[in-house]
Amino acid sequence: MPKLLNKLITLCGLLMAASPFAAAQSCDQPGPVSERGQQLAQLALDEYAQFNGHRIDAQGRLWKFGNVEVESEPLVDGQPGDRYAWRRVWRYWQTLDTHSPGTLELRRITWAPGLLDDPATAGRSRFTELREFLDKRPKDADAKMDEIVREAVVRAMISDTPWSAAFISYLMDRAGLSAEEFRYSAAHAVYIRPALEGQEGYAYRACDVRRTQPRVGDLICYGRAAKPLKSFADWQAQVSELDTRVKSHCDIVVKLDRKAAKMDTMGGNVEQSVTWRKLMLDDQGRLSTRHLAALHPKPSGPNAAACASDPSCQKSDLNLQYWGVLMQLR
């Protein structure tokens, strides 16, 4: 009987490992890459190819400048309905709106009274929700002019509104994650919170980026803004307050080369584009400490023009961030 039991246990383990959605066992024992992880990575790679975005090298330098969010030049391989970059970003928002109705209408446009005609006396900047504009525009306007204005306003909204979480939500939608598996939101912190709380049935587990090996399909996240969450401990301490006001960003891991000690990630709204980033790993296969702003304070030196003639100017590093959370795909 004991031998039979041991065989059954072994068989169960093999079946779990062979499952297309094989779960990561823990932060310390990530396990193999799942089919869902590979699917998410491929979706991100396909999206990058269509958008033709930026690329950042392992030193944090922008070495390829691609299309940006409000680009009006046709995408090389764009789908007929999304032939421009800005229309593609609008697609991300539309997809998010199907999971969180009202998201689109609440996006805001920034403007200032009199700014075009008399900038010297222009009023302070104001915000208007997209819903208000659409409701109040003239109903009897010429169809052509109405379309021109509507498209211009949508492009302005896209420029004014961070869309990186909408990009991640779009990928999750394409991969078929349910509302129980992923908290669709326009803010990364909202979908990070259930992972930190250990919500049952959630697709991701929250781990310390400094202690966990990333896998394809995982998300790596950092805090940003004036008072960012700088470490995993900060995220844990603030878990009950994580909402749309908490500024953060997440990339999805799309490739890993442990021999070369590097990984590739993809993120939306990174320098206003869908951006491919290369990051370095340490000898344990974890994110290199060279990328951790909590250990290496960000430089705040002269601007780029001054750097041309100032040898003391510190180079910008787009990879130096307050990386704290690794969202491990279960």
Locate the predicted segments by residue.
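Bacterial N-terminal signal peptides that target proteins for export
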Residues: M1-T10
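Bacterial N-terminal signal peptides
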Residues: I9-S19
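Secondary-structure boundary elements
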Residues: S19, R174-A179, K255-K262
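Sec/Tat signal peptide C-region and signal peptidase I cleavage site
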Residues: P20-A24
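N-terminal capping segments
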Residues: Q25-E180, Q321-R330
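Short, solvent-exposed loop/turn and secondary-structure capping segments
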Residues: I56-Q59, E181-Y184, F232-D234, W276-L279
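...with weaker cross-activation on analogous glycine-rich loops/strands in unrelated enzymes
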Residues: Y184-E271
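Low-complexity, Gly/Ser/Thr/Pro-rich intrinsically disordered linker/tail segments
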Residues: Q272-R330
